[in-house]
Amino acid sequence: MFQVQKELAGHEAVIVALFEEEKMSSFVQELDKAFEGQLQVLLEEKELSTKKKAISKVHSLGKTNVKRYYFVGLGKKESYTTETLRAALGKAFKTLQAAKVQDAAILLDSFVTEKLDAIDVAHIAAEVQGLGTYELQTYKSDKKDRVELEKFMAITSEDAQEIEAALTVGYVHGRATNSARTLVNMPPNVLTATKLAEYAVELAEKYDMDYKVLEKEEMEDLGMGALLAVNQGSVEPPKMIALIYKGKEEWKDVIGFVGKGITYDTGGYSLKPREGMVGMKGDMGGAAAVLGAMEIIGELRPEQNVIAVIPSTDNVVSGTAFKPDDVITSMSGKTIEVLNTDAEGRLALADGITYAKKLGANYLVDVATLTGGVIVALGNYTTGAMTNNEELFEQVLEASMETDEPIWQLPIFDRDKERVRNSKFADLNNSPGREGHAVMAGTFLGEFAEDTPWVHLDIAGTSETKGAHDLGPAGATGAMVRTLATLVERFGEE
């Protein structure tokens, strides 16, 4: 689909950058010659907009071998960022999709500045082409035909092989993020823990990864009482899923991802209200993020060792469901007093973290739609983060900045640890109260990471959006897929 050329050679549509400068760029000036000065007139009349994310369509009327030009407003060069570029190109590709364009090109060099080189632009363009045009996979009987972009040409004077490589990496990042989106959007009667495990196994087999899927009896043998407690009320069997990618000859410096895989969350006996329960099919967003990252890793084959662990079940009410006041024993041996059955994700993750360590993880990153508290604190754009190791956190932070998936660190103080350790009956309690709820959840998980370098990512606010946006429709976002993959790709770099 993606190709590289030095010159335009007849396309339905070409995407061109337009900055808010006193003079037209050399690329636009060259086009203006073919248009006999008409582009300059359109700019002066403000019919070509340079405002950020503005899309201006100009028909060539036979003046060039391109049918239409789509000028993408980027604002002033000094405020130009990768985030600006992603949003603007996302809108541009959605515009092309609405016009049913099948053959398009991008004048890559017109987007290059001192801040962003052609490789950056190529990566983002290919990534955003997938993200921006993603459509919800629905179960409607009346399905409309989708017109796909079949050919996309990057026009540049830069090295073709380097640009092709960047396009490939960007495309893989976008596609894997969309895979995660599709998982999160699936209804819970379709995506059970068993189906999630089957998906993970297919992924592992496709990319020649080792894998393990523990059944209930094996979990009992290993003492995974926290995950099993959450599963107690369900007719669906639990799964502890592990994918193992060996990118080095020696099994060392292993990065462990742990993704929350609660396929539906009613809250259990600490029952959610109706409005709080609808949408809880997305409570496995952490698992989807981890699987999306493993898809990228499988495609790009970085020289790193990676484990992905997903504790999966639903959390429902029944005569056998676990209850507030229960005391359970986790795989780590630590006992937990259950004060809230709707704080089930941290219980599943506790055993997931311990299992990842057992499999050899030297570094841990857990990802979970864990708390409403993080949404109150940070909103729907920023992922909450907590850590016991600043060096590892800095690497995660740098990866998130590269992918424009912002994270913000929340604290863990000794008094927070005292709150999760405050129980008359057990080593820990799973819900000390609403105050500092996001911090309490992360602090609880830190009790299981112990001395292993660990970062916790709470994506409750960022995993889904209520409305359409520049990088896709309402629904799942695929949050943290690209950040996790970029962390692996860059891990250990100075």
Curated annotation (Swiss-Prot):
Gene Ontology terms: biological process: proteolysis
Residues that hold Mn(2+) 2 according to the record: 260, 265, 283, 344
Record flagged with keyword Cytoplasm: yes
One GO cellular component term: cytoplasm
Localization annotation: Cytoplasm
Residues that coordinate or bind Mn(2+) 1: 265, 342, 344
Keyword Transit peptide (UniProt): no
Xref: SUPFAM superfamilies: Macro domain-like, Zn-dependent exopeptidases
Catalytic activity: Release of an N-terminal amino acid, Xaa-|-Yaa-, in which Xaa is preferably Leu, but may be other amino acids including Pro although not Arg or Lys, and Yaa may be Pro. Amino acid amides and methyl esters are also readily hydrolyzed, but rates on arylamides are exceedingly low; Release of an N-terminal amino acid, preferentially leucine, but not glutamic or aspartic acids
Cofactor annotation: Mn(2+)
UniProt-listed InterPro entries: Leucine_aapep/pepB (IPR011356), Macro_dom-like (IPR043472), Peptidase_M17_C (IPR000819), Peptidase_M17_leu_NH2_pept (IPR023042), Peptidase_M17_N (IPR008283)
Gene Ontology molecular function, alphabetical: manganese ion binding; metalloaminopeptidase activity; peptidase activity
Enzyme class: hydrolase
Active site location: 272, 346
Keywords: Aminopeptidase, Cytoplasm, Hydrolase, Manganese, Metal-binding, Protease
E.C. number(s) listed in UniProt: 3.4.11.1, 3.4.11.10
Pfam families for this protein: Peptidase_M17, Peptidase_M17_N
Superkingdom of the source species: Bacteria
Job description of the protein: Presumably involved in the processing and regular turnover of intracellular proteins. Catalyzes the removal of unsubstituted N-terminal amino acids from various peptides.
Family affiliation: Belongs to the peptidase M17 family.
Protein name: Probable cytosol aminopeptidase
Lineage: Bacteria, Bacillati, Bacillota, Bacilli, Bacillales
